[in-house]
Amino acid sequence: MRITQDVFQKMRDDGEKIAIVTCYDASFAALLERAGVDILLVGDSLGNVIQGEETTLPVTLDDMIYHTLCVKRGASTAFIMTDMPFGTSQVSPEETFRNAAELMAAGANMVKIEGGSVMAETVEFLTQRGIPVCAHIGLTPQSVNQLGGYKVQGKTDYEAEQLLEDAVALEQAGAGMLLMEVVPAALAAQVTRTLSIPTIGIGAGKDCSAQVLVLYDMLGIYSGKKARFMKNFLTGAGSIEEAVQNYTRAVKTGEFPGPEHTF
């Protein structure tokens, strides 16, 4: 039986950390599930690591449907979260619902939508109609052109206050989880204390309810500059499955992320 969203709320309430890894195919879905990963994120990062694009912007809804179907076939119990790609959640709540419904039909248990309080109306529209939503704030890769590149968000007092306001608005709109990407650890901790829903961090410190890494980054498969929040868990492991087990254990015990992975 597949894990449901309420399990993660209880884990958050009990102080139990949640381990998340991106996943794009059936074989890795089965492996990640065996290794104890709680949530499989079908990320639009597939544009970077699978398609070879510089950004996630070219990824289409059909791409996300295809990879969600693949992951669903490989995982029997793990919770599946799927990104809504660029252009599929920005036009109107009604159009977003139609697109999200296709992802849910493909096997997603929750969709992830990038954007702050401007997306609150859309989040509310979806959640009131049975589609669970994870909101995504901080560094939102789909807005990389507007943000001026991949850099830390929430560094100034004004930016930090805005992100906190965004987080509260999105929870009030019905978001079941909130992902924060590349924000100062102290700010992520403040948001986590303020909200009652699970928070997910990537480059956001150890105080979030959950941690997520891109599968390829976790296995040391990357080119170019290594991001600060990355850690190669394959180093010293005897197999890929053992590497994932080491990651899951490090998240659950609070060993990862360390100070060297945060801002």
Swiss-Prot record:
Database matches in Gene3D superfamilies: Phosphoenolpyruvate-binding domains
Entry function: Catalyzes the reversible reaction in which hydroxymethyl group from 5,10-methylenetetrahydrofolate is transferred onto alpha-ketoisovalerate to form ketopantoate.
CDD domains (UniProt xref): KPHMT-like (cd06557)
Binding site for 3-methyl-2-oxobutanoate: D44, S45, D83, K112
One GO-annotated biological process of the protein: pantothenate biosynthetic process
Record's GO cellular component terms: cytoplasm
Cofactor names: Mg(2+)
Compartments reported by the entry: Cytoplasm
Family: Belongs to the PanB family.
GO molecular function, one term: magnesium ion binding
Keywords, ordered alphabetically: Cytoplasm, Magnesium, Metal-binding, Pantothenate biosynthesis, Transferase
Domain of life: Bacteria
Cofactor binding remark: Binds 1 Mg(2+) ion per subunit.
Pathway given in the UniProt record: Cofactor biosynthesis; (R)-pantothenate biosynthesis; (R)-pantoate from 3-methyl-2-oxobutanoate: step 1/2
Chain sites annotated for binding Mg(2+): D44, D83, E114
Active-site residues annotated for this sequence: E181
Organism: Nitrosospira multiformis (strain ATCC 25196 / NCIMB 11849 / C 71)
Catalytic activity, EC: 2.1.2.11
Reaction catalyzed: 3-methyl-2-oxobutanoate + (6R)-5,10-methylene-5,6,7,8-tetrahydrofolate + H2O = 2-dehydropantoate + (6S)-5,6,7,8-tetrahydrofolate
Subunit structure: Homodecamer; pentamer of dimers.
Name of the molecule in the record: 3-methyl-2-oxobutanoate hydroxymethyltransferase
